Amino acid sequence: GLFADAVKKDRIIHVFGTGHSHMIGIELFVRTGGLANINAMLDDSVTTAAGARRGGKIEKLEGLAEIIWEQYQIEEDDIMLIISNSGRNSVPVEMAIKAKAEGLKLIALTSIEHSMNCRSRHKSGKKLYELADLVLDNCVPSGDSLMDFAGVKSGPGSTIAGCLIADSILAETLNKLSAEGVTLPVFGSQNVDGFNNNDLYEKYQSRIKHM
C-alpha cells in the first residue's frame, strides 16, 4: 500500500483538509500508536480556529492552496491524503492539482454521492475524486446527514467515517510492515510511564512543521 511504501522509502505522508475535514489529519498526527511520518497540514485560515464562517468562505478561494503548500516541506514522491466530504471547494481541489503537479501520489477521502450531486467551485471544473490516484469513498450521503428528525437533517457522518477509514488504513499498514520485518515508526503513549519517543522526534521534526 501507499502508506507502507512511504515508511519503507522514508517519505512523508501529508494530510490536508479544510473545515471539519482537518480533524482527520489531527486523528493521525503524533498519536499514540500512530505513524511518526505523518504531517498534518493545519492552517488556521481554513479551519474553524479563526472563525467558522470566515473559514467557510476562505476554503472557496483560489490561490490559497499554493500559499499553504509553501509553509511545509513537501517533496516529490511523498504521499498526500486530502479529505473533503463534498470534494468541490477550491482549496482542496487546488491542493490536489498542486500535489499531482509536484509528483506526489494523491489519495482522496470523500463522499462520492455528495460529489456526484454538486458542481465544482474551482475554475477547472474538477472535483477532488477526479484528480486522485486512489479514491476512498466514505459512503456518507449527500448533505453529510445520517438521520432525519421530522424533516430536519442531522447526524453528520463524514468525520466519524473518515477517522474509521484512516485508522483502518493505519492498522493495515502496520500489519503489512510488521509481516515484512520492518521497524515500525510508531509513537508510544506519553501517558504511560517509561515512554520515550525522542528518536522519532529527532528523525522527523526537521521535516514535519507542527511536530
Language model feature labels by segment:
Residues 1-11, 73-75:
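Glycine-rich phosphate/diphosphate-binding loops that line cofactor/substrate pockets in enzymes
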Residues 9, 34-36, 175-211:
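Active-site phosphate/pyrophosphate-binding segments
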Residues 14-170:
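Glycine-rich phosphate-binding loops that contact phosphosugars or nucleotide phosphates
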